[in-house]
């Protein structure tokens, strides 16, 4: 989940609402679910086992720049663990993310060959240079509320 400053406001509220729904689904289906938040640095939260850390996450605003490098490294590390080796990945972001080094993007292809599906949920209408690296990116458009 992209927690950079560009996600502040309506995108942040939308992302948090979706995250709450994903938590509910994981509980109902008794599925593992792991959250990796990122802006410049990353935080990892096992959302079914570490509720305190999850509540702490919801109490902090989204801030900072965006760098997906460490998030991707954390994702690949998790996918290499037995517990998550059959997992799929969902990246929630406005996709105002600078591209990573080609070797990291190549690792996405390696994991895709192992059966991992990479999905995205783009909040907003920013140009998206990541589309070719995902199996599918869903898009939610929104309008900025005007203040008078």
Locations of regions flagged by a protein language model:
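Von Willebrand factor
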Residues: 1-47, 53-92, 96-99, 121-129
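Non-catalytic, mobile gating and regulatory segments of ester bond hydrolases
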Residues: 5-9, 32, 45-53, 80-85, ...
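Active-site-adjacent loop/helix micro-motif of nuclease/hydrolase catalytic cores
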Residues: 10-14, 68-70, 99-105
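Short, surface-exposed linear patches
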Residues: 20-23, 29-30, 56-59, 111-115, ...
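A generic secondary-structure signal
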Residues: 21-25, 74-81, 110
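Short, surface-exposed, polar/charged, turn-prone segments marking secondary-structure boundaries
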Residues: 26-29, 61-66, 116-120, 145-148
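VWA/integrin I-like adhesion module and closely mimicked acidic/polar interface patches used
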Residues: 63, 96-141
């Amino acid at each position: 989940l992209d927690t950079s400053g560009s996600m502040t406001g309506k995108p942040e509220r939308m992302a948090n609402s979706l995250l709450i729904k994903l938590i509910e689904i994981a509980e109902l289906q008794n599925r593992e679910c792991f959250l990796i938040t990122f802006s410049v640095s990353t935080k990892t939260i096992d959302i079914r086992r570490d509720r305190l850390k999850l509540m702490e996450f919801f109490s902090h605003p989204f801030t900072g720049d965006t760098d997906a490098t460490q998030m991707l490294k954390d994702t690949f590390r998790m996918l290499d663990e037995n517990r998550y080796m059959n997992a799929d990945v969902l990246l929630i972001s406005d996709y105002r993310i600078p591209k990573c080094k080609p070797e990291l993007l190549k690792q996405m292809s390696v994991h895709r060959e192992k059966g991992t599906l990479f999905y995205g949920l783009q909040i907003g209408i920013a140009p998206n240079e990541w589309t070719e690296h995902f199996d599918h990116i869903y898009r939610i458009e929104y309008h900025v509320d005007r203040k008078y």
